[in-house]
């Protein structure tokens, strides 16, 4: 299967649009699983976005166009997709897992769903497995979409 993130901008944009269209009527659980699976396929770099420089983060379409993803950028793609589907009970957290590794996790529906950790594990990981170090300003992230 071809990784959409290895294709050109138009193909990535079309695939992301089709993902959102296909999930319009899905329940929150299904949306979380499919969105996580989609964004988990991005090729990762070590550092792209700084967690405390939200004002300079790309909007959703710039993110897809630039096609550079660290764990934070991958989580941001998930959040943008959730927001565009009308899901706004979302938190973006910097945390450490039970192995003391730093992670950027997306919590949905009052932390019922944990995204941006392991593929296919959206429903199987408890937020208790993490020590939340900082919650990023979700309103600033929402404003990025509002400004486009």
PLM features per residue range, with description:
Residues 1-148:
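A structural boundary/capping signal
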């Amino acid at each position: 299967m071809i990784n959409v993130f290895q294709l050109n901008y138009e193909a990535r944009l079309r695939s992301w649009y089709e993902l959102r269209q296909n999930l319009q009527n899905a329940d929150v659980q299904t949306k979380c699983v499919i969105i996580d699976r989609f964004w988990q396929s991005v090729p990762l770099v070590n550092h792209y976005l700084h967690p405390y420089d939200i004002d300079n983060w790309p909007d959703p379409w710039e993110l897809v166009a630039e096609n550079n993803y660290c764990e934070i950028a991958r989580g941001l793609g998930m959040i943008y997709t959730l927001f565009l589907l009308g899901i706004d009970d979302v938190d973006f957290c910097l945390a450490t897992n039970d192995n003391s590794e730093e992670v950027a996790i997306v919590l949905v529906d009052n932390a019922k769903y944990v995204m941006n950790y392991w593929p296919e594990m959206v429903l199987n990981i408890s937020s208790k497995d993490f020590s939340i170090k900082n919650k990023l300003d979700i309103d600033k992230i929402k404003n990025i979409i509002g400004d486009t």
